[in-house]
Amino acid sequence: MTNPANPSPTLRVLVLAPTRRAASETFVRANLRRLPCKIVAYFGDERPLLAPLRLSYGLAILCSKALTRLGALRLATLPSSLVAWGLIRRHRPDVLMVEFGFHAVRVMEAAAWSGVPLVVHFRGSDASAQGRIGVLRERYQRLMKLVAGVIVKSQPMRAALLGLGAPADHLIVSPSGADEQLFGAAGSPKNAPPIFVAVGRFVAKKGPLLTIEAFGRMLQDLPDPLGRQARLVMVGEGPLWGEAKDLIASLGLKAAVSLEGVRSHKEVAQLLRGARAFVQHSLVAADGDSEGSPVAVMEAQLSGLPVVATRHGGIPEVVVEGATGFLVEEGDIAEMAKAMGRLALDSALAGRLGAAARIRAKGQFTVQHHLAQVGTLLAQVVWERRDRSPGG
């Protein structure tokens, strides 16, 4: 049998995800809709009374969560794994792909019982030493003995999982990438007004409050009339939205900062095309939550914008300091303000960095690149499992 470079349209993939909200994320949706495979997906928050399998799966995940909260980590695996095993028998997939590592430990025994190769897609805090790894270390070590393949978003995530025994030859670093269908049209930061755009949930790891503070400090140093022209546009919502609104008021930035709430991809793409730069102050949150490689950063670069961000997670693998943007240390508001100020003052510099960012994104960080890597891994683990089987 020849090892295929790409997945066959007949390849059957059973996808298990914790919630439908997770599936609404751009990167998960791309996996479900664009992989050239036969995909069936189940979600842990479903409770459809007229679909017994989906109801059973949702209830099993609920039970596993409750047992996890009680500290019965080994027992927590059984309800979900039993139902997942039933799903495998029902759908007979060639490969099982589970979204998020913390969800994989709930269903991992089903892969062991069935012999179906298991591929796990880690995305952020689920592969953070400060986050869930600390709580689930023993379970993750068991998971790494069962997986046939692992997908992560950044080199720090790769290092963390290698330390737990992940198979190095089947562990790929594959940022989710930007969608060229949505963000393929380039803006012109050289000709744009000094508008800075931030896109992301208002949660601690995205650092929205620090971004606002850095913008406010930048305004203090900008000469007129540039200081009166500069704007910060923030897209998203979340638990820190109220604090962000209060901070804007306390800093006297109501005229310069706008909170746009949730916007469609089309609207975000339009905002990016009219901006000077993209900004994001990612950092490790107090609870250990952290980023992989933020999709919004790649979308901004594909749109031709320079990026001002932090040396956090996989961001330094995407943003090249001084070539496609500027990087600062987590929590360094002064340096972030200075980097933003450079782009506000020098539109030609913004244009050069943005052009380089677009070239780099098109060459390495698109959804198409990501799906090609994922598809190849899925095909590889299936081929290897069949090759080792008695009839292979």
Identify the meaning behind each predicted range.
Residues 98-104, 122:
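Short His-centered aromatic/hydrophobic patch
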Residues 318-322, 326-333, 342-348:
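Conserved acidic donor-binding segment of nucleotide-sugar-dependent glycosyltransferases
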Residues 1-55:
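N-terminal subdomain of nucleotide-sugar transferases
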Residues 156, 177:
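Carbohydrate-associated surface elements
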Residues 297, 302, 306-309, 319:
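Short hydrophobic beta-strand element within catalytic cores of glycosyltransferases
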Residues 14, 187-217, 233:
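Conserved donor-binding/catalytic core segment of Leloir-type glycosyltransferases
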Residues 243-266:
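Nucleotide-activated donor-binding/catalytic signature segment of Leloir-type glycosyltransferases, i.e.
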